[in-house]
């Protein structure tokens, strides 16, 4: 059995505190995880719910048969892109060492992430008095000045994936440290801006047929005009046909302290793929806000505004990992909105009310009571969002988005204005 001591290094704690022990072993070919809270953590922080699948009591707790790692730790794991990098590194090492390729578990992925750039506020040790894992000074997040090399490396890795061959070791080595701490499928890496702030760089994919990075930046600016709290973004051109998107990490303070983050997926105890087809939707997030958040009214209004915006621009890639929360001394609160992109879809991936996922602003208005929003307030929010979205062509022109791409989304934007 392998074990890690879990520490909370949250920005509002005076110092890092032991949360508990995470254990892992492979039983009869299946991954098994266990977690035990530190008794002092439970005494001091009894009101904090870290994950739906971990209860606040002192006994050892186990994941359900067939389940993966506990939800609160899965939020710190890489998604498709980061896992691809780690898998290819393992294949390259196995080839060099003339051994069989070792299958990687979520525990392996957790062990492989750089401490500095890991999402959220958890840190891990193998020994109580030892150092945190993966804090080697040789592991450094590259500065923004190296972005061109990172873009090139990501394209070389994508090229090798297309050709079903292993990438050169140098490309993996360049991306493995900054690129494995982040979720999502697109090529990306962590970088430091000129002020030393930790940022996410999303690179153009070789598969892109439009400027996805520029449209995501557009969506964030438009959402900000609609009164939504958003992650700060900007774009870099001149690195290829399309733009690279930069997004400032919102789980770090100006002093680089860690703000703990959790996805609505882990806080609700859901899994990848839970969406409207399974009866899941925005009202599940409403339930969590009512039960687990501080500033309940403010968070409910913010969520309602985001749903209205998603409907108006067709942001339908809206899974539970794309709605996050930050932990404050008073409780959870919605994180800034992120990963917003227009699509041509006329249905949301989430139910808007109890039964419909049709992207119709009137369905949202008629469901205002389910969001605990008075109808008059709901009308005001929707009008403010529509007023902002109606300016979309002006903003797109200002950002020099090509007319061909603007024409692609024009009719979709009209649907709910």
What label would you give each PLM region?
Residues 1-320, 324-417:
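Phosphate/dinucleotide-binding and metal-coordinating scaffold of catalytic cores
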């Amino acid at each position: 059995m392998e074990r890690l001591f879990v520490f909370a290094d949250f920005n509002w704690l005076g110092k890092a505190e032991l949360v508990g022990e995470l254990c892992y072993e492979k039983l009869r070919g299946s991954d098994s995880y266990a977690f035990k809270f530190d008794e002092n953590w439970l005494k001091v922080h009894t009101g904090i719910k870290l994950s739906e699948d971990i209860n606040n009591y002192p006994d050892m707790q186990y994941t359900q048969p067939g389940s993966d790692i506990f939800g609160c730790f899965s939020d710190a794991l890489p998604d498709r892109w980061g896992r691809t990098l780690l898998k290819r590194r393992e294949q390259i090492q196995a080839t060099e060492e003339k051994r069989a390729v070792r299958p990687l578990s979520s525990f392996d992925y957790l062990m492989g992430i750089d401490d500095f750039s890991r999402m959220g506020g958890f840190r891990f040790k193998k020994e109580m008095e030892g150092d945190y894992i993966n804090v080697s000074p040789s592991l450094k997040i590259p500065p923004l000045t190296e972005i061109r090399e990172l873009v090139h490396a990501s394209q070389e890795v994508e090229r090798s994936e297309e050709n079903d061959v292993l990438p050169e070791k140098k490309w993996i080595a360049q991306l493995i440290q900054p690129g494995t701490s982040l979720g999502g499928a697109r090529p990306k890496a962590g970088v430091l801006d000129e002020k030393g702030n930790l940022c996410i760089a999303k690179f153009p994919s070789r598969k892109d047929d439009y400027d996805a990075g520029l449209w995501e930046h557009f969506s964030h600016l438009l959402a900000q005009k609609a009164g939504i709290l958003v992650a700060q973004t900007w774009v870099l051109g001149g690195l290829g046909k399309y733009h690279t998107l930069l997004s400032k990490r919102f789980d770090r303070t100006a002093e680089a302290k860690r703000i703990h983050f959790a996805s609505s997926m882990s806080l609700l105890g859901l899994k990848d793929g839970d969406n409207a087809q399974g009866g899941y939707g925005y009202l599940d997030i409403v339930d969590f806000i009512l039960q687990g958040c501080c500033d309940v009214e403010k968070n409910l209004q913010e969520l309602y505004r985001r749903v209205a915006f998603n409907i108006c621009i067709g942001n339908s890639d809206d899974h539970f990992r794309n709605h996050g929360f930050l932990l404050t001394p008073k409780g959870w609160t919605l994180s800034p909105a992120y990963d917003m992109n227009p699509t041509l879809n006329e249905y949301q991936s989430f139910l808007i009310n109890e039964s419909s996922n049709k992207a119709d602003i009137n369905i949202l208005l008629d469901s205002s009571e389910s969001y605990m929003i008075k109808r008059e307030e709901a009308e005001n929010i929707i009008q403010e969002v529509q007023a902002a979205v109606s300016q979309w062509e002006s903003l797109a022109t200002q950002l020099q988005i090509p007319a061909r791409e603007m024409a692609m989304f024009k009719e979709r934007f009209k649907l709910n204005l």
